[in-house]
Design a protein with these regions (language model features):
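N-terminal "arm"/small-domain region of PLP-dependent enzymes with the aminotransferase-like
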Residues: 1-41
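Conserved active-site segment immediately N-terminal to the catalytic lysine
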Residues: 179-190, 200
Length: 387
């Protein structure tokens, strides 16, 4: 196979931290509030601006509360579980590495007596029809390490008594979110917005706030996780008064991303960019003799974390360690040629390729990286078969 001679303009395909919005450079951060307290008037204004712009772009209902929290999406999910659980039985639905992490917390770390853990292997969604609306529920909207997303939220009752916590970190800003079905939604700045790591967002419904004020967990809650003070909802967190000190440089960076999102047409265009990225890969997969989607149901294929695996019988016959090493070499060849970075699948996922297709990735760059994946696979396979 002939080596491609056209490379992506931006070869960054990492699933986090994700590539910056087109046109980004360090000069865009020149107005950052550096050397000033995040609790100063100007500091709080910047933080509140992040909250309000996020609400407007994502079309979050006015009655939902939005807060900036530490430790990225992970911190936001942990905060929700540790503060809200203990009143009702808990169900966790997981099908990728991070969903399995939440299942570990619920099943082994939190002292919960009645927890149901519905786990499936990579590529398959669990059976949501088993859910009980009296229970609290945790799930990821999009399994970032599996490339598998939920089809819809029809399985969530509008008259539920339990709370629904959704880790939506690789879904928001690229997929339409049905807010009324969710009581807690979390995400980070580093995913679809292409901003910096370490900062998370937590969104609470009125029902979640009611739980905070009516239930005190039986376990200690560290300061960094506390969403309530003496059974009173801590509103300050949701008006720019963060629990601990955020990076004001990162705040300026995420404001740039949010302004960029507004400038291109808001949530509708963000979703369209990601959808087009997936359609480009789908068309390529249809003609591929080597690759297929990891997702087994076409309706569940993610448009952000696009995971593909070799279907080549030669590859399937390799030992597991050999498969892992082979795909590392494939991705290494692409990187050596500066045609695509960070394309290797997640360490616990089946060996393959993961292309980030979020809204900061331009469609033409996805088109340009695909021939390099074909070439690198064949190049490395020839080395293996000739040894």
């Amino acid at each position: 196979m002939e080596k491609p001679n056209i490379k992506p303009n931006c070869p960054n395909f990492s699933s986090g931290p994700c590539t910056k919005p087109p046109g980004w450079n360090l000069d865009k951060l020149k107005n950052a509030t550096l050397g000033r307290s995040h609790r100063s008037k100007v500091g709080k204004q910047k933080l509140q601006e992040v909250i309000e712009k996020s609400r407007n772009i994502l079309k979050i209902p006015d009655e939902y509360h939005i807060g900036i929290v530490p430790a990225s999406d992970t911190g936001a999910v942990e905060m929700a579980m540790w503060c809200l659980f203990g009143q009702r039985n808990v169900e966790v639905y997981s099908w990728d590495n991070f969903g399995h992490d939440w299942a570990t917390d619920v099943g082994k770390q939190l002292p919960l007596e009645n927890a149901s853990l519905e786990k499936t292997d990579y590529g398959i969604l669990p059976d949501f029809s088993k859910s009980d609306s009296d229970n609290d529920i945790v799930f990821t909207w999009n399994g970032t390490t599996a490339g598998v997303k939920v089809k819809n939220l029809d399985w969530i009752s509008d008259t539920r008594k339990g709370l629904v916590i959704c880790d939506a970190t690789s879904a928001v800003f690229s997929m339409k979110v049905d807010w009324k079905k969710l009581d807690v939604v979390t995400y980070s700045w580093q995913k679809v917005l292409g901003s910096e790591a370490g900062h998370g967002m937590i969104i609470l419904s009125p029902r979640a706030v009611e739980r905070l004020e009516s239930h005190t967990p039986s376990w200690p809650i560290p300061k960094i996780f506390r969403l309530a003070k003496e059974q009173k909802f801590n509103k300050d967190i949701f008006s720019g008064a963060t629990i601990n000190t955020p990076s004001m440089l990162c705040v300026e960076d995420v404001l740039y991303s949010l302004n960029w999102a507004e400038s291109i047409g808001g949530i509708e265009e963000l979703i369209n960019i990601s959808k087009r990225n997936l359609e480009i890969v789908k068309k390529w997969i249809e003609g591929s003799e080597v690759f297929e989607f990891l997702a087994q149901d076409r309706e569940t294929i993610s448009s952000t974390s696009i995971c593909i695996v070799p279907k080549d019988e030669w590859f399937k016959n390799l030992e597991q360690d050999a498969k892992v090493n082979f795909m590392k070499e494939v991705c290494s060849e692409i990187e050596k040629n500066e045609a695509g970075y960070d394309l290797n699948s997640y360490k616990t996922a089946p060996p393959g390729i993961r292309i980030w297709g979020g809204s900061t990735v331009e469609n033409e760059d996805v088109e340009k990286v695909l021939p390099w994946i074909d070439w690198a696979y064949n190049f490395v396979k020839e080395k293996y078969t000739n040894e």
